[in-house]
């Protein structure tokens, strides 16, 4: 008997424009709800405030965990997209500084939703691990662009920036951490400038 030829799965369908708008609206409302109410945020309320029925919410996000993961992933994707946007609208060093400050804002917002992320199977670390490549690539690309422009020393290691600012995440329980993190951005950049 001849072997049956396996056919590849069909490509993922792109969402219709209205379905995409619904999904984005649900994510925005869910982010606010999880930030305000924690993991106990009502999915029914999220659907209602998004202007969609429960069936639409569950079609996009079958479980609460799926919705939490999508909210987090969406925020990380926006952060990565901002790096690319800054790269096309600002000089390299200014773009790096702006993106690092935006990263601090991302960390500040994330501290409010971490308790919710911890309710996901595998916890917040699983979600953070999944976004590591996007964040690392954005840091690395931005630093390398500033090196190529001559605004940072050639021996500057993008990983130093990554380590320093990812380390900021571990200080968020301390008073004044955000102002300190913003100073750290200026210290990192000043310390990496070429000597004249």
Language-model features and meaning:
Residues 38-39, 59, 153:
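Helix-turn-helix/winged-helix DNA-binding modules
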Residues 1-10, 137, 141-149, 167, ...:
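C-terminal peripheral helix-coil segments that are non-catalytic and often amphipathic
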Residues 70, 81-109:
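Hydrophobic alpha-helical connector segments
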Residues 98, 104-138, 166-174:
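Short secondary-structure transition hinges
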Residues 51-61:
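Short hydrophobic/aromatic patch on the recognition helix
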Residues 127-134, 148-163, 172-180:
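All-alpha amphipathic helical-bundle segments outside canonical DNA-binding/catalytic cores
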Residues 1-49, 66-69:
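Basic, helix-initiating cap at the start of DNA-binding domains
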């Amino acid at each position: 008997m001849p072997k049956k030829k396996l056919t590849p799965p069909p490509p993922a369908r792109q969402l219709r424009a209205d379905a995409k708008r619904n999904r984005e609206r649900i994510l925005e409302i869910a982010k606010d709800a999880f930030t305000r109410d924690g993991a106990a945020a009502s999915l029914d309320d999220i659907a209602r405030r998004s202007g969609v029925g429960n069936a639409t919410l569950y079609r996009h996000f079958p479980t609460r965990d799926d919705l939490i993961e999508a909210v987090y992933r969406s925020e990380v994707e926006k952060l990565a997209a901002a790096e690319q946007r800054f790269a096309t609208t600002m000089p390299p060093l200014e773009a790096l500084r702006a993106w690092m400050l935006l990263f601090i804002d991302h960390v500040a917002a994330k501290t409010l939703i971490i308790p919710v992320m911890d309710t996901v199977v595998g916890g917040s670390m699983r979600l953070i691990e999944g976004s590591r490549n996007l964040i690392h690539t954005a840091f690395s690309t931005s630093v390398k662009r500033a090196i190529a422009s001559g605004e940072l020393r050639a021996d500057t290691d993008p990983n130093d920036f990554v380590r320093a600012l990812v380390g900021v995440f571990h200080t968020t329980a301390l008073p004044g951490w955000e102002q300190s993190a913003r100073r750290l951005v200026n210290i990192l950049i000043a310390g990496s400038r070429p000597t004249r």
